[in-house]
Amino acid sequence: MCHGKIAPKSSSEFVVTSVGHGVFLQLVILCALLGDGLASVCPLPPEPENGGYICHPRPCKDPLTAGSVIEYLCAEGYMLKGDYKYLTCKNGEWTPAMEVSCHLIEDKETHALGVPALSIVASTASSVALILLLVVLFVLLQPKLKSFHHSRREQGVSGDQVSIMVDGVQVALPSYEEAVYGSSGHCMPPADPRVQIVLSEGSAPSGRNMPREQQLQGQEACSSAGGEDEAPGHSGLCEAWGSQGSETVMVHQATTSSWVAGSGSSRPTHKDTADSENSDIQSLLSLTSEEYTDDIPLLKEA
């Protein structure tokens, strides 16, 4: 203090003092920052065998400070043990604390793939067995089917009647012969009886065998057709044929007897006999003409 006044300090001392305080403050701040930084840095995370980790956000910083997040991954064919796979750096430690490891998953895949494989093999085997069974059944039943078809065809050709059900009523279908030849079947219709009468009347003794031959031919036709199954009207027509043949023979015999009677009418000793024969001939002619007229509608109906 000089003359009652405070003497000022020197400027050099003030500068040194202020610099010393500033440096000390900076050192304290730096130490605090370094301490916090060292305390927030986490060590490298454990890396599992057959696996690794990635950082979020990428890329990984060095060092890994607080707030850094890592995700664990496993190699192909391996799976991470546990469901949680993320670790976070807090206060220099990784949380949550857990053991990270990767293990094989081939056993599970083999077991999972084994069931579909077995089902595929079983379905294939069953389908092949079914196809073989169908082939065997077809081979065994083919002869029976052929014989059944052949028998049905023979029934259709031979003329056996086949019936069907129409509204609960059994209706008989016509056979092949009935559909083609009518109800007469194979029996051929006889010749016109009037022509036979004319031939028998105009024929000489040399024509006596003609009606009998025609009758034999008609009987042979009826006998050949009688061996097969026929319609009900077939036998009736053949009987009419036989009756007409016999009537023709009778007419022929009557005409021949009339011819003999005419040649001997000049004899006076047999006059009464000739008259009786002429009356018999007239009755026979009238009878045969009536019967032939009755038979003609029958032929038209056939």
Swiss-Prot record:
Gene3D superfamilies: Complement Module, domain 1. It comes from Mus musculus (Mouse). Disulfide bonds join 42-89, 74-102. It is a single-pass membrane protein. This is Sushi domain-containing protein 6. The keyword RNA-binding does not apply. Residues 1-39 form the signal peptide. The chain crosses the membrane at residues 120-140. Residues 40-104 form the Sushi domain. Residues 212-222, 256-267, 279-290 have a biased composition (Polar residues). GO terms for cellular component: membrane. Its main location: membrane. Pfam families: Sushi (PF00084). PROSITE patterns: SUSHI. It is found in: Membrane. InterPro entries: SUSD6 (IPR042866), Sushi/SCR/CCP_sf (IPR035976), Sushi_SCR_CCP_dom (IPR000436). PANTHER family: SUSHI DOMAIN-CONTAINING PROTEIN 6 (PTHR46839:SF2). Residues 202-241, 256-302 are annotated as: Disordered.
